């Protein structure tokens, strides 16, 4: 692309958001930032410190004290907590189970939103992925996209990923977790999951990853031309 552009991509888990966002960033020659990884780093720090994720005051203090950084890479960002590469550990089951509770705490979101805005303001185009990018983090982004898919489709995708990774084949348990996470994300008091009024909503239920990336690339080009 000839001009820099900021693309905000939001949506619930299991919509293909991460893989699509990475693919779109590669197609655009843009940087990529997964803001969910930052919430996972704070969650990991909280768990390592033995803090109850429901203790808002203690979690808030931990969020303010944590030292984190993100190393941009075309194949996926690397996440560093106090200088330690925790890119794999933040994707573990314990962090996954606690991240919704931690990310719902206002002090955590305040700290990370500021960091995310700083990262997005750097030179060049960037694709920023999360759950409140178009509504809170980057409300003035010229391109806002909200990915969605049925809970059943998202659970099937996640279960297939688990099986491929050698984990248990348990679709019903995964579906229950998807619905639980949806409820937590959409009803939290601070920055609930929702599409921005000017976001383009894309249902990925019946689309392949390549089809979604191609569609979003066209949307970005169209919106970028309009925004000039």
Swiss-Prot record:
Residues the entry annotates as binding ATP: 11-19
Pfam families: Cytidylate_kin
Gene Ontology CC: one annotated term: cytosol
Transmembrane segments: none
Location of the protein in the cell: Cytoplasm
Enzyme class (EC, first level): transferase
UniProtKB keywords: ATP-binding, Cytoplasm, Kinase, Nucleotide-binding, Transferase
GO-annotated biological processes: nucleobase-containing small molecule interconversion; pyrimidine nucleotide metabolic process
Catalyzed reactions per annotation: CMP + ATP = CDP + ADP; dCMP + ATP = dCDP + ADP
Main location: cytoplasm
A molecular-function term among this protein's GO annotations: ATP binding
Protein's UniProt keywords contain Repeat: no
EC number: 2.7.4.25
CDD domains, alphabetized: CMPK (cd02020)
Similarity comment: Belongs to the cytidylate kinase family. Type 1 subfamily.
PANTHER family attached to this UniProt entry: CYTIDYLATE KINASE, CYTIDYLATE KINASE/PANTOATE-BETA-ALANINE LIGASE
Name listed for the protein in its UniProt record: Cytidylate kinase
Species this chain originates from: Mycobacterium avium (strain 104)
């Amino acid at each position: 692309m000839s001009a820099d552009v900021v693309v905000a991509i939001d949506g619930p888990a299991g919509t293909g958001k991460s893989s699509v966002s990475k693919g779109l960033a590669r197609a655009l020659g843009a940087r990529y930032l997964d803001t969910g990884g930052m919430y996972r780093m704070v969650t990991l720090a909280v768990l390592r410190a033995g803090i109850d994720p429901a203790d808002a005051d203690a979690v808030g203090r931990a969020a303010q004290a944590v030292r984190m950084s993100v190393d941009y890479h075309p194949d996926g960002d690397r996440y560093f907590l106090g200088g330690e590469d925790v890119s794999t550990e933040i994707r573990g089951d314990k962090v996954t189970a606690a991240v919704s509770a931690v990310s719902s705490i206002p002090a955590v979101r305040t700290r990370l939103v500021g960091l995310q805005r700083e990262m997005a303001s750097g030179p060049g185009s960037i694709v920023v992925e999360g759950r409140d990018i178009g509504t809170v983090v980057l409300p003035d982004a010229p391109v806002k996209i909200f990915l969605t898919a049925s809970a059943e489709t998202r659970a099937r995708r996640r279960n297939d990923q688990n099986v491929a990774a050698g984990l248990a084949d348990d679709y019903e348990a995964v579906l229950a977790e998807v619905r639980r996470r949806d409820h937590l994300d959409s009803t939290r008091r601070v920055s609930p999951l929702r599409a921005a009024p000017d976001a383009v909503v894309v249902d990925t239920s019946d689309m392949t990853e390549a089809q979604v990336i191609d569609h979003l690339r066209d949307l970005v080009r169209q919106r970028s031309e309009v925004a000039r």
